[in-house]
């Protein structure tokens, strides 16, 4: 064999090895038909698929340990802690044990099948192992959405839901743009059109953005308008900002991972805030979208007032340092990834 042939074969081996490495690196956790995704991103709910159903970090023993880690955080993201636990016990009309003792949370996870419990673990991306999964999920999603979307994002989060059989999650709306990935068990999620004013009137959205996270009210007479997704392990669904929904767990333990991000204050958000104060002052503001020029003026005026208030009060205009570090790390990861 001459030297030229040998060098060519060695070069081919290097190219093949590089292609294999890139192929492994591009193996996706979250995926969806690109056309479906681009048409519906932050507009309409749609199904996605994921590869986490058999991952060891999402088995109950690992989740019990994770719950204990989250409960014991010395610097939680939220002032009241990053763990929420509702055991479905009512005393005199109010829920008891909404935030269970830190000592018993791991046991609650292990015994989840026997109760009526709903456990939420927030910002699990702060824990080793889960961080890498979360970052890859976000990068997969942003590959589909278009990498420029990251410029409009304020922060990212991974939330884990562990739910007892047959538990219902009440009707609500969220300010985050999210993807719910079903890992264990099955559940139905009922979505409603956020543009349907019968289902979600303007005043409910206005109160939501300003004073009341629970302002959205379920109206059973419109249940027939719901778009229902039946989630099994390996399936997921996209929930656009402010899309009303409620969930019904199946007759088994459900483990769901919610990958979400929150956009910077948008004209849309500020418009509802401006309309809230106008309505309180006795005006009857037009629904967003009917008078675009007026909408834009109100939104910009509200944004300017908020900026002045932040400066007067000395409030930060960016999120916590750790959240910003997560953001920049994801931006770097996106830049290093090749095309789909």
Per-region residue spans from a language model:
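A gly/proline- and charged-residue-enriched helix-loop-helix capping module
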Residues: 126-160
């Amino acid at each position: 064999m001459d030297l030229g042939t040998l060098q060519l074969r060695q070069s081919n081996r290097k190219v093949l090895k590089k292609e294999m490495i890139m192929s492994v690196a591009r193996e996706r956790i979250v995926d969806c038909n690109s056309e479906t995704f681009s048409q519906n991103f932050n507009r309409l709910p749609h199904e996605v698929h994921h590869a986490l159903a058999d991952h060891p970090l999402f088995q109950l023993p690992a989740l019990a340990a994770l719950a204990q880690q989250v409960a014991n955080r010395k610097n939680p993201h939220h002032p009241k802690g990053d763990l929420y636990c509702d055991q479905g016990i009512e005393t005199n009309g109010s829920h008891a044990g909404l935030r269970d003792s830190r000592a018993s949370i791991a046991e609650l996870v292990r015994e989840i099948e026997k109760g009526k419990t709903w456990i939420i673990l927030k910002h699990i991306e702060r824990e080793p192992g889960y961080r890498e999964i979360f970052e890859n999920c976000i990068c997969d999603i942003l590959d589909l959405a278009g990498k420029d979307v990251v410029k409009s994002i304020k922060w990212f989060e991974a939330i884990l839901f562990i739910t007892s059989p047959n538990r219902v999650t009440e009707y609500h709306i969220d300010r985050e743009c999210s993807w719910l990935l079903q890992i264990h068990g099955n559940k139905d999620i009922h979505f409603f059109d956020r543009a349907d004013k019968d289902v979600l009137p303007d005043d409910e959205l206005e109160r939501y953005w300003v004073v009341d996270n629970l302002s959205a009210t379920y109206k059973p007479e419109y249940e027939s308008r719901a778009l229902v997704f039946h989630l099994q392990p390996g399936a997921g669904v996209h929930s656009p900002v402010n899309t009303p929904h409620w969930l019904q767990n199946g007759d088994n333990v459900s483990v769901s991972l919610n990958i979400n991000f929150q956009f910077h204050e948008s004209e849309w958000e500020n418009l509802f805030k401006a309309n809230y104060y106008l309505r309180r002052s006795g005006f009857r503001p037009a629904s967003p979208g009917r008078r675009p020029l007026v909408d834009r003026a109100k939104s910009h005026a509200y944004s300017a007032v908020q900026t002045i208030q932040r400066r007067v009060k000395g409030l930060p205009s960016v999120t916590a340092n750790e959240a910003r570090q997560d953001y920049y790390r994801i931006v770097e990861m996106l830049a290093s990834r090749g095309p789909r």
